[in-house]
């Protein structure tokens, strides 16, 4: 009798999410995720930097974490300089930990701070990955409303007061203050100061995620919340994946040693890829300013194209706020429309979009929202894809 093999279904972790499907290729009109524009990738510069790296010290490749577990010094030094110049954060390279993307940065902080059943405050609409991590840990997630100026401090104060009256102290306030994901808002400086004051009053740290802060379309914006902090209340993270591309899995955490020494005990991957670190350090040390100006200009053109396409093909039935930068538009559909029913029909037309519920502390509160990433598709694909998407919503009973 033939061996039928082992039935793994009886062995799987009982808390696993539903199984994933096989990769079927990318859709023609790809508005999901944090994909970047291939035309903006500085391949010649990467080739030059890679050549410089391969002529360097072979011990960086032959040893685990040759320059220590926090990452290579040239990249940490570049980050410390960049954060001081562009975000107002004065730290030393010893206060920087290089991570394998910002997702690892988030999970390392969760590992250090969270226990099952803890409470965390987030923005009402927030990064889907961060929300997923929290739900897997069985964390009580409380969403606080945003407006055009970012997280509302009046509502945050109310939530903190209510929790305190119940004897609950949140482990942190997770915020994306600069080009918020998914809404694109920028927290005003007045609110940044107020957020710090509330952190001090209630003894709750701030978890500041600035993955998109490089992507302002023009000028500069408010300094990071971490730059205002003189009492170790702010944990700050960022990423190279949005400045270069998600194929570069590099992020970072800026934290004081009291937290850093704990983070290092939870980073069990034997070190973030050294080759990526070395190439990015070499390239950005010499080309960062020119590169980021080129990226901002390219993203702005695509943002303008997507906004115009939505207005032409959806008309006044959708609400769209023009962001000051970033990679996304947060689109509000008419009340009563559930975007989830259009995911399948859209995919049949080669169109992929992110359903709003994935980006909300309360999924049902975002049923009539979609998030569109404009970085990857060409301007022609943006116009074609949005025209087709409008037809999908109309043909399948949507009000758009």
Task: Please give the residue ranges for each predicted region.
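Conserved core of the PLP fold type I
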Residues: 60-202, 207, 213-231, 299, ...
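Short, solvent-exposed loop/turn elements at beta->coil junctions and helix N-caps
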Residues: 240, 317, 357-361
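PLP-dependent aminotransferase class I/II
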Residues: 233-312, 319-323
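Conserved PLP-binding catalytic core of the aspartate aminotransferase-like
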Residues: 317-350
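PLP-dependent enzyme catalytic core of the Aspartate aminotransferase-like
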Residues: 1, 348, 363-400
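N-terminal small-domain helix-loop-helix segment of the aminotransferase-like
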Residues: 9-100, 284-286, 352, 395-400
């Amino acid at each position: 009798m033939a061996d039928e093999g082992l039935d793994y279904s009886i062995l799987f972790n009982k808390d696993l999410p539903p199984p994933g499907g096989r990769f079927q290729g990318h859709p023609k009109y790809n508005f999901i995720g944090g994909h970047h524009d291939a035309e903006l990738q500085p391949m010649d510069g990467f080739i030059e930097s890679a050549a410089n790296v391969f002529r360097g010290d072979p011990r960086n490749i032959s040893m685990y974490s040759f320059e220590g577990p926090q990452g290579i010094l040239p990249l940490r030094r570049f980050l410390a300089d960049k954060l001081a110049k562009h975000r107002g954060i004065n730290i030393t390279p010893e206060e920087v930990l290089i991570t394998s993307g910002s997702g690892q940065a988030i999970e390392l902080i969760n590992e250090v701070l969270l226990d099952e059943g803890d409470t965390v405050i987030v923005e009402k609409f927030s990064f889907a990955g961060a929300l997923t991590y929290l739900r897997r840990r069985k964390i009580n997630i409380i969403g606080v409303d945003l407006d055009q100026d970012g997280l509302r401090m009046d509502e945050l104060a109310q939530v903190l007061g209510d929790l305190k009256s119940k004897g609950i102290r949140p482990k942190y306030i997770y915020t994306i203050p600069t080009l918020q994901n998914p809404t694109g808002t920028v927290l005003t400086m007045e609110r940044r100061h107020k957020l710090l004051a509330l952190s001090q009053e209630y003894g709750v740290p701030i978890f500041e995620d600035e993955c998109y802060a490089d992507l302002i379309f023009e000028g500069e914006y408010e300094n990071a919340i971490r730059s205002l902090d003189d009492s170790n209340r702010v944990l700050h993270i960022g990423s190279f994946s949005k400045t270069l591309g998600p194929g570069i899995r590099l992020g970072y955490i800026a934290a004081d040693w009291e937290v850093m020494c704990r983070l290092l005990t939870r980073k069990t991957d034997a070190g973030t890829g050294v080759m990526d670190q070395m190439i990015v350090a070499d390239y950005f040390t010499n080309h960062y300013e020119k590169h980021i100006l080129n990226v901002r200009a390219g993203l702005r053109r695509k943002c303008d194209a997507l906004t115009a396409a939505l207005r032409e093909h959806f008309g006044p039935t959708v609400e769209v706020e023009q962001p000051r930068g970033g990679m996304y538009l947060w689109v509000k559909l008419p009340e009563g429309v559930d975007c989830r029913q259009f995911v399948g029909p859209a995919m049949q037309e080669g169109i992929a979009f992110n359903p709003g519920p994935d980006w909300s502390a309360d999924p049902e509160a975002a049923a009539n929202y979609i998030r569109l990433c404009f970085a990857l598709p060409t301007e022609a694909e943006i116009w074609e894809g949005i025209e087709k998407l409008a037809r999908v919503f109309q043909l399948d009973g949507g009000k758009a």
